[in-house]
Amino acid sequence: MEYILEVERNLFLTLNGVQHPLLDGFFYLISAKWTWVIMSIAFLFFLFYKKPTKEALFIVGAVLLSVLICDQLSSSFFKPFFARFRPSHHPDFIDYVKTVYGYRGGKYGFISGHTTNYISLALFTSRIFRNKFYTWTIWSVVALVIYSRIYIGVHFITDIIPGIAVGLIVGHFVYKVYLYARSRWLGASCPAHPSAVYAGDSIRLWTLSLIGFVFAMLCMSRQLTEILQYYVFLLF
């Protein structure tokens, strides 16, 4: 056990120690919840524009269910139950961990709520759309978000791994609930699978928009961070 803890400590400090001004802004932005508001609006537009309203509403409902379950599990159950300090608050790490722009997060970090939420949403949406381009893209973006939690110093690796497991379970559960509800209430009025509704140029355009958004954050990370820090007091 001591060996495992030492390995995790060294690996965490190595991953956390890869600091660069450009990456500071990028990982700070990609980790912030409010940064994704514009893409959330774009996602709603993608779901509803020239698509069956009921089909889109079922997907929105499933996404909200996923977020609700993940938030409750991570914030209301795991964090207060295990009460494990984040690296940025842990007495054994606080002098060694590198934070970004002074952000340290809440007191407890087990499990990672960001990881749980993003993994669940990635699994659910990749199963909904069944598009390889989108699947590779969304999982790549999720990997960046997960690493950002280590980079900015607010999660241990052992906060991340259980978060991945819980996210996969929740994502699978929500997908099954969605399929059941969809077949029961939409029935013969809808295609056999929602991927038929969102196939073709529609899903490709949404995926390219997602890639473009992440690339824009990387290219303009320092400028965007300065603007957001000036106008928004709380990004997370």
Curated annotation (Swiss-Prot):
Sorted alphabetically, the Gene Ontology cellular component annotations on this record are: plasma membrane
In the bilayer, the protein is annotated as: Multi-pass membrane protein
The molecular function terms of the Gene Ontology recorded here are:
phosphatase activity
Please name the Gene3D superfamilies in this protein's record.
Phosphatidic acid phosphatase type 2/haloperoxidase
User: Record's superkingdom?
Assistant: Bacteria
Q: Which GO terms describe its biological process?
A: lipid A biosynthetic process; lipopolysaccharide biosynthetic process; response to antibiotic; symbiont-mediated perturbation of host defenses
Q: Which UniProt keywords apply?
A: Antibiotic resistance, Cell inner membrane, Cell membrane, Hydrolase, Lipid A biosynthesis, Lipid biosynthesis, Lipid metabolism, Lipopolysaccharide biosynthesis, Membrane, Transmembrane, Transmembrane helix, Virulence
> Where do the TM regions start and end?
26-46, 58-78, 134-153, 160-182, 200-220
Matching InterPro entries = P_Acid_Pase_2/haloperoxi_sf, P_Acid_Pase_2/haloperoxidase
Pfam families named among the record's database cross-references: PAP2
Part of which pathway?
A: Bacterial outer membrane biogenesis; LPS lipid A biosynthesis
Phenotype upon knockout is: No longer responds to changes in hemin, decreased removal of 4'-phosphate from lipid A species. Accumulates pentaacylated 4'-phosphate lipid A with concomitant loss of the usual non-phosphorylated tetraacylated lipid A. Lipopolysaccharide (LPS) or bacteria from this strain are a somewhat potent inducer of the human innate immune response via Toll-like receptor 4 (TLR4) in cultured HEK293 cells; double lpxE-lpxF mutants are more potent. Loss of resistance to the cationic antimicrobial peptide (CAMP) polymyxin B.
Q: What is its EC number?
A: 3.1.-.-
- Is Transmembrane helix one of the keywords? yes
List the subcellular locations: Cell inner membrane
Record's keyword annotation contains Cell division: no
Q: What does this protein do?
A: Removes the 4'-phosphate group from lipid A species. Absence of phosphate groups in lipid A renders the bacteria resistant to host-derived cationic antimicrobial peptides (CAMP) and allows it to camouflage itself from the host innate immune response. Removal of the 4'-phosphate may be required to generate the substrate for deacylation of the pentaacyl lipid A to the tetraccylated lipid A species.
Further information: When grown in low hemin conditions the major lipid A species are non-phosphorylated tetraacyl and 4'-phosphate pentaacyl lipid A, while under high hemin conditions the major lipid A species are non-phosphorylated tetraacyl and 1-phosphate tetraacyl lipid A (hemin is protoporphyrin IX containing Fe(3+) with a chloride ligand (CHEBI:50385) involved in the change from healthy to diseased gums).
- Which family, according to UniProt? Belongs to the lipid A LpxF 4'-phosphatase family.
Its protein name is Lipid A 4'-phosphatase
Q: Which gene encodes it?
A: lpxF
